[in-house]
């Protein structure tokens, strides 16, 4: 099964997550099919806390990819931000 989930990166005590499409059986930080964007929970100043390709995420969900709870929240958040920008 294909999932959309967060892959952890960054340093100790400074998490940074890539939003990726991957097989459910692969390790959390292992190989992935496509990187859709990133989430930086400790962003400060001019740093963007979330960048996500909403169109690609919708396309993967239409193909049957299952987002995790947190990934689904971030997708909704990115959609709202995109609509507000228009």
UniProtKB/Swiss-Prot annotation:
One of its GO terms (cellular component) is small ribosomal subunit. Gene3D superfamilies: 3.30.1320.10. It holds the Pfam family Ribosomal_S16. Keywords: Ribonucleoprotein, Ribosomal protein. GO terms for biological process: translation. It comes from the Bacteria. Transmembrane segments: none annotated. The keyword Ribosomal protein applies. InterPro entries: Ribosomal_bS16 (IPR000307), Ribosomal_bS16_CS (IPR020592), Ribosomal_bS16_dom_sf (IPR023803). GO terms for molecular function: structural constituent of ribosome. The keyword Ribosomal protein applies. Belongs to the bacterial ribosomal protein bS16 family. PANTHER family: 30S RIBOSOMAL PROTEIN S16, SMALL RIBOSOMAL SUBUNIT PROTEIN BS16M. This is Small ribosomal subunit protein bS16. The lineage of its organism: Bacteria, Pseudomonadati, Pseudomonadota, Gammaproteobacteria, Chromatiales.
């Amino acid at each position: 099964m294909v999932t959309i989930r967060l892959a952890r990166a960054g340093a100790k005590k400074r998490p940074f997550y890539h939003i990726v499409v991957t097989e459910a059986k692969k390790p959390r930080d292992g190989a992935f099919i496509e990187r859709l964007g990133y989430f930086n929970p400790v962003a400060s100043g001019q740093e963007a806390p979330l960048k996500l390709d909403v169109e690609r995420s919708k396309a993967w969900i239409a193909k049957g990819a299952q987002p995790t709870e947190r990934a689904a929240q971030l997708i909704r958040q990115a959609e709202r931000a995109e609509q507000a920008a228009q």
